[in-house]
Structure formats: structure tokens, C-alpha cells
Amino acid sequence: MKTIEVDDELYHYIASRTQAIGESASDILRRLLRLPASPQPFVLVQENMINELKDLAKLPKQKKQLHQQDKVIKQVEFVLASSLFNNETKGVNRFLYLLSALYKADPESFSHATENVQGSERIYFARDEQTILATGSSVKAKQIPESPFWVITNNNTERKGIILCALMNAMELPEELVARIKAQFN
């Protein structure tokens, strides 16, 4: 029996394929690689099997990303269809409703996206009001509902749309959804 090191993601993938209590990692890998159940003195693994195993290791992460993206899309669709959003006359409130929905649906992706979305001279997102206010004398900020984030709010409607679209693109949301949001802020 030999010992090998595998990264956490691969370890969790192999462990998730356990079919019986006490099944060893060797048994699981033999099943996944379609090798005989009894150990052989030497087994030649073909290149295509190695590539197939690499592809299998990527599947859980891709499925998680797709599931998370679906959750975000549904949350945004819900806001767009809500009477609260459609009856709201103030652009800043519509802006905050959508930002809140994006955060609630995928806080991790939202957080990463805010790090990449900023103006040439202003910070658009921060975890405290003072960080945003420090970027200019006439800057106003509001807290995004149900999130730890603050956002700059004294932009015109079109700029709010640009900020939202940039954030959604950074979150890797579908272009057609981004285009629908952009149309709301023209």
C-alpha cells in the first residue's frame, strides 16, 4: 500500500463517491477508473482515463457554480417582478433592492465582485460608510439592505445601471439578465 497526497477538493470528491461503510480509497478509485476489484501487480492507466478523472474532479465545483448562479438569477427575477420594485419611483431604492438581492443570493461572489468594481476616482462599494465618504467631498453612501456593504448613491440613474451591470458581469451572470438590468437604468 502506497501513500499519495491529494488536494482537498479531490479528497472530498473521492469521499463523496463512497458506496459502503469501510470502503477504501483504493476501492473507490478502482470503481471510478473501472479497474478490476482485486489488486493487480501492475496496472497501466491510459491517458484518456487520466483526463476523464480530471474532468470528473471538476464536476462538483461546476455544478455548485451553476446552482449558485440559478439562485442569483431567480432572486433577481423575483425582484424585477415584484410590485415593490415596479412601483418604486426612486432610482436609488430600485438600485438598493437589486444590490440586496444579489448579495442575499450569493454573498461570496458578491463580495469578490465588489473588489473589482470601482470608478477611476471613487470607490463604489465598501464595508463601512467612511471608506466611501473619504473618496470625495460630495459623496453620499447608503447601506445595502440586509448586507454588510455600503454603496455610493449620488450617481445619476445611468451610472447606477453601469455599476450594477459591472457587478453582475464580475459575478459572471448571464448577459441577457445584465441587459435587462441595464434597460431598467437608462
UniProtKB/Swiss-Prot annotation:
GO terms classed as biological process: negative regulation of DNA-templated DNA replication initiation; regulation of DNA-templated transcription
GO annotations of cellular component type: cytoplasm
Signal peptide residue numbers: none
Highest rank taxon of the organism: Bacteria
Keyword list, A-Z: Cytoplasm, DNA replication inhibitor, DNA-binding
Subcellular location per the Swiss-Prot or TrEMBL entry: Cytoplasm
Cytoplasm found in the keyword field: yes
Stored InterPro entries: Arc_rbn_hlx_hlx (IPR013321), Ribbon_hlx_hlx (IPR010985), SeqA (IPR005621), SeqA_DNA-bd_C (IPR026577), SeqA_DNA-bd_C_sf (IPR036835), SeqA_N (IPR033761)
GO MF term (any one): DNA binding
Gene3D superfamilies found in the cross-reference section: Met repressor-like, Replication modulator SeqA, C-terminal DNA-binding domain
Record note on quaternary structure: Homodimer. Polymerizes to form helical filaments.
Similarity field: Belongs to the SeqA family.
Biological role stated in the UniProt entry: Negative regulator of replication initiation, which contributes to regulation of DNA replication and ensures that replication initiation occurs exactly once per chromosome per cell cycle. Binds to pairs of hemimethylated GATC sequences in the oriC region, thus preventing assembly of replication proteins and re-initiation at newly replicated origins. Repression is relieved when the region becomes fully methylated.
Full protein name: Negative modulator of initiation of replication
Organism encoding this protein: Glaesserella parasuis serovar 5 (strain SH0165)
Gene this chain is encoded by: seqA
